[in-house]
């Protein structure tokens, strides 16, 4: 209703300020996020109507990859890290944790390559092998879940959120981190046997 193929948010930052935003998945929707955000604010759609008079202070715009890990991340004299490498969690569309974590790995690999006077793709490949070993399966599983979520109606989303509300704090953190190891998914499906969780388990268990 508020943000096609994505989600909208209102995050209070003080008594009188808040961050209001929309995230719209491409190519699932051709809606312009800037146009949609202004429409929500100007027409006071949904929860925004409860905020009173709104004065726009700042505007920020960005792109976050959510198409999985289909790209190379090392070339001769070049290492890609963070968003440019596709290192983003498709479920919550954030990647700062990955950027920091694997930025350190990239720095160490690059330093060794420079020390050895060899910055070819072959000398930088240990970086790609390390980060893919750590999170490739998690992100690929999260993409499957995201693809399912994109097709949900608002009512189906409400049912999905009912399931998420039943999770413990640790289970929820694993979920939004896309930590879909088979052992954890079996435990999740056992503790929360509703059909939607079983569908989620079936979707990611083979990765």
Labelled PLM ranges:
Residues 1, 5, 67, 91-94, ...:
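Surface-exposed loop/turn and secondary-structure junction residues enriched for glycine/proline
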Residues 1-38:
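Conserved FAD-binding catalytic core of PHBH/FMO-like flavoproteins
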């Amino acid at each position: 209703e508020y943000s096609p193929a994505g989600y909208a948010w209102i995050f209070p930052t003080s008594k009188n300020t808040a961050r209001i935003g929309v995230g719209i998945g491409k190519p699932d929707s051709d809606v312009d996020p800037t146009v949609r955000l202004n429409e929500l604010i100007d027409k006071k759609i949904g929860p925004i109507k409860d905020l009173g008079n709104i004065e726009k202070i700042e505007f920020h715009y960005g792109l976050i990859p959510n198409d999985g890990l289909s790209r190379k991340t090392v070339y001769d004299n070049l290492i890609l890290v963070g968003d440019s490498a596709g290192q983003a969690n498709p479920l919550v569309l954030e990647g700062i944790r990955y950027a920091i974590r694997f930025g350190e790995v990239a720095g160490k690999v690059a330093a060794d390559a420079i020390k050895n006077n060899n910055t070819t793709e072959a000398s930088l490949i240990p970086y790609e092998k390390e980060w893919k070993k750590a999170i490739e399966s998690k992100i690929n599983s999260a993409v499957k879940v995201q693809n399912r979520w994109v097709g949900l109606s608002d009512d189906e989303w409400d049912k999905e959120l009912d399931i998420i509300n039943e999770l413990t704090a640790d289970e929820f953190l694993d979920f939004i981190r896309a930590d879909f190891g088979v052992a954890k998914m079996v435990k999740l499906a056992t503790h929360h046997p509703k059909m939607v969780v079983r569908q989620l388990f079936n979707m990611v268990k083979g990765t």
